[in-house]
């Protein structure tokens, strides 16, 4: 029985990782490519960051999806290994904290706040745009993405 649960969890995580990656890759061919990386980020896939509240497999799924996306698109971002490693770890931490949230409203905060304050460190450094300006750009884009997806969540997850 435990193997079935593990297989089920891995499958769900893989589906979420794939969906995240596909959404990021799709965005790079749409007219919104410049919003995928940089001081203003509006990633369509970031709407998925509220999924850990409903599904524990979303925690590793989002991490792997972000990691794969950042690897594939590292040539576009210009941030290299720091974005691949640190960006993916920020997503993992945000997903974990989202999973622990007591309500869907609190669940929206970790991806918005952590991406805003942490990802802005290297984006600001490499882009030359002031840190707090970058924080506002990344937090704003993250908030838009997350708030669009939040209505699909149940009121609270046990």
Regions found by a protein language model. Give the residues of each.
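Hydrophobic transmembrane alpha-helices
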Residues: 2-57
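Juxtamembrane loop-helix boundary motifs flanking transmembrane segments in multi-pass membrane proteins
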Residues: 2-6, 63, 127-132
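Small-residue packing motifs within transmembrane alpha-helices
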Residues: 9, 13-17, 57, 61, ...
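Membrane-embedded alpha-helical hairpins and interfacial helices in multi-pass inner-membrane proteins
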Residues: 25-38, 47, 67-158
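Membrane-helix boundary elements
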Residues: 53-75
């Amino acid at each position: 029985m435990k193997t079935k649960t593990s297989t089920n969890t891995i499958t769900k995580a893989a589906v979420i990782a794939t969906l995240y990656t596909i959404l990021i890759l799709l965005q790079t061919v749409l007219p919104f490519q410049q919003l995928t990386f940089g001081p203003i980020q509006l990633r369509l896939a970031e709407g998925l960051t509220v999924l850990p509240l409903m599904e524990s497999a979303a925690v590793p799924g989002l991490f792997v999806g972000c990691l794969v996306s950042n690897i594939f698109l590292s040539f576009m971002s210009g941030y290299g290994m720091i974005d691949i490693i640190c960006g993916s770890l920020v997503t993992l931490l945000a997903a974990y904290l989202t999973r622990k949230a007591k309500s869907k409203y609190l669940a929206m905060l970790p991806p918005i706040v952590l991406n805003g304050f942490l990802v802005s460190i290297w984006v600001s450094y490499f882009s030359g745009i002031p840190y707090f300006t970058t924080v506002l750009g990344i937090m704003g884009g993250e908030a838009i993405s997350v708030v669009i997806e939040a209505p699909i969540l149940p009121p609270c997850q046990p």
